[in-house]
């Protein structure tokens, strides 16, 4: 069997041994169900996932499936491997930018204030320009914050890429048309409180107003440090604007990653990128499912 979770087995097995007082429980002569060792291990997994702030609802779903699977004689590493695989499957296959379709490909970034949308745009744009030699352009519709526009302009200057400021869907389409020969057009939008209906409507009109001749996709940028209840409210707000893929920022500012799984399962949106610092373009990567799952199970990346 491929040892996908060695980094976790040692930690969890040690906890299991301590919980049993260092002794192996006696097996019944004719076992009819999971042994006390196996059930103790499931309890440890339960505790570990909760400690990493996976919602109790999802922990119960996953471990409920595992308890049905357990048979007498199953080793703890078999149980852990099955939990690992179930978590991997629940996260799904992360997706990068979809460059299919006619140029230019328009990429919207939406999300609340303070999550790092503008920096995330710069990181992705830098990757595609430098690593893949794509022509990139920027549009900002974040006219509420002068600092955001200035920040994006700095990145545009560094990448020697054009940038436009737009105030309406008409101006947006004019700007996109101007960049018709570019591969990627990145659109920065204003962050807003999920309670602000007016700004929400502005973003919706902008995204839905893109001329259908252009291919486009939307990324919801969320901070991994945001409280679960607030994340649910944010997702509920933005899902009324558009379908989206998920980007999680600030992974370097938290030690628990349960909300990444919680929001993936709650939103049923595809995962895309994670960021773990301010350095452009380095501190970004495609969502590393195996690394995140290992951390959820108490291991190291």
Located regions from the model:
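Non-catalytic terminal/linker segments enriched in charged/polar, low-complexity residues
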Residues: 1-90, 95, 103
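NTP-binding/hydrolysis catalytic cores, primarily Walker-type P-loop NTPases
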Residues: 22-23, 49, 261-301
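Hydrophobic anchor at the beta1->P-loop junction of P-loop NTPases
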Residues: 107-109
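Switch II (G3) loop of P-loop NTPases
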Residues: 112, 136-147, 158-172, 179-202
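Conserved lysine of the Walker
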Residues: 117
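Hydrophobic positions on the alpha1 helix immediately C-terminal to the Walker A/P-loop
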Residues: 120, 124, 151
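Conserved beta-strand/loop subsegment of P-loop NTPase cores
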Residues: 135-137, 213-222, 239-254, 258-261, ...
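Inter-motif core of Ras-like GTPase G domains
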Residues: 177-184, 199-225
